[in-house]
C-alpha cells in the first residue's frame, strides 16, 4: 500500500525531467517520463509509474498546475494522463498499461487534437 505524503506542504517538488514526492521522512525521485497517469482520490492523488504507486496529500488541480502541459493532459475530472504512454484510444476511454481510463465528453476533442492521428 502506498504511503501518504506526510510533508508540511504536501506539494511535489518538480524539476524539468523529474519530481520529488515526500514518502515518510524522505523525498523520492520520480522521472516524469515514467509517470503513466495520475488519479484523484478526494483530496489525495495517486501517481502511477511504471513500477510504483505513490499516494500524495494534494489535489489533482494542484498537480495539474505544476506539470508540463505538453506531456500531461487532464482527460477526466479524476485523471491526468501522460500522452506518451497511451496504448489505445477508444470512444470514451484511453488504455494505458492495460488500464482503461475514462475520457470526459468535453475533454475528448482536446485529447484528439493533442495526439497525432493518420
Question: Which role does the model predict for each range below?
Answer:
Residues 92-95, 102-105, 109:
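C-terminal structural segments of small proteins and small subunits
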Residues 2-96:
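Conserved binding/recognition cores within well-folded domains
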Amino acid at each position: 500500500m502506498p504511503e501518504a505524503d506526510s510533508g508540511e506542504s504536501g506539494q511535489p517538488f518538480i524539476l524539468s525531467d523529474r519530481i520529488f514526492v515526500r514518502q515518510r521522512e524522505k523525498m523520492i525521485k520520480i522521472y516524469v517520463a515514467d509517470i503513466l497517469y495520475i488519479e484523484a482520490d478526494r483530496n489525495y492523488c495517486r501517481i502511477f509509474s511504471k513500477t510504483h504507486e505513490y499516494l500524495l496529500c494534494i489535489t489533482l488541480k494542484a498537480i495539474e498546475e505544476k506539470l508540463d502541459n505538453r506531456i500531461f493532459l487532464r482527460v477526466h475530472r479524476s485523471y491526468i494522463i501522460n500522452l506518451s504512454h497511451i496504448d489505445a484510444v477508444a470512444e470514451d476511454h484511453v488504455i494505458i498499461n492495460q488500464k482503461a481510463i475514462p475520457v470526459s465528453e468535453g475533454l475528448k476533442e482536446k485529447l484528439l487534437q493533442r495526439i497525432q492521428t493518420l
